[in-house]
Amino acid sequence: MSYADSNGIAFYYDEHGEGAPLVLLHGGIGSGQMFASLAPALANRRRVIAIDLQGHGRTADVDRPFDVAAMADDVAGVIEQPGGTVDLLVYSLGGKVALRLALQHPERVNDLILVSIAIKRSGNHAEAIAAMDAMTPAAAEFIKPSPPGQFYAANAPQPEAWETLIAKTSDAIKHDYDWTDEVRGLRPRTLLVFADADSVRPAHIVEFYGLLGGGLADAGWDGSNQPANRLAIMPGRTHYDILDSALLAPVVEAFLLR
């Protein structure tokens, strides 16, 4: 097992392959195990590093809320050790952390692949917001039989902290946020990836891509007006299974090879 220290926390990370580092950040209550089907495909060309965030997976929790700005600083400290500057492929909560990382520490990030993330809370469908609001500490026992719950019980250094994980996640996802103005100045070259039945509203996807210079004009017959940033939609997928799409790895590889 591999660990890297940052801000007083020992962060677990799983590593596959060789080459330029590609860091993966998972979604809420999950772990790097969320990328189990994707990481081996990406490791054919890259050194893939899946980090377990604070209080998730094999990384122990500390007396601190799940604040994405602080978690971004954590990741900045971790990636100083594998090479300093990395590409990032990130999902859901991990996407929020990575977006803050790219805004707070732009010198650490080359390319950024954001999977199923809204840049403001209202960018999610009403049903998704209602589901976030329904995730309370009282739901911990109900969620425990889920794959993330089973993985946590078997692998977490403090499996008895499951209710704390749910409570902190519950608090974090209820906070309103709007990063629209900051995203306009996002520096890393960025690929946005969404499912065609995502928890993020289609109108918000268009808005997000537009803030990155995408979809504002025709690219021209020769593609000379094509934006540097990209948008991909995974067909037949949802927010909850998008990482299992067979199309995701080739889309990511094509973007990184540009």
Where are these regions (language model features)?
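Catalytic histidine-centered segment of alpha/beta-hydrolase-like enzymes
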Residues: 232-246
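Conserved alpha/beta-hydrolase "acid-adjacent" motif
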Residues: 199-207, 216
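Acidic catalytic loop of the alpha/beta-hydrolase fold
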Residues: 197-201, 239-240
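Flexible "cap/lid" loop of the alpha/beta hydrolase fold
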Residues: 96-104, 110-149
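Short beta-strand/loop motif that positions the catalytic acidic residue
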Residues: 186, 192-194
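Active-site loop/oxyanion-hole signature of alpha/beta-hydrolase fold enzymes
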Residues: 37, 49-89
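Conserved HGGG/HGGXW glycine-rich cap/lid loop of the alpha/beta-hydrolase fold
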Residues: 9-60
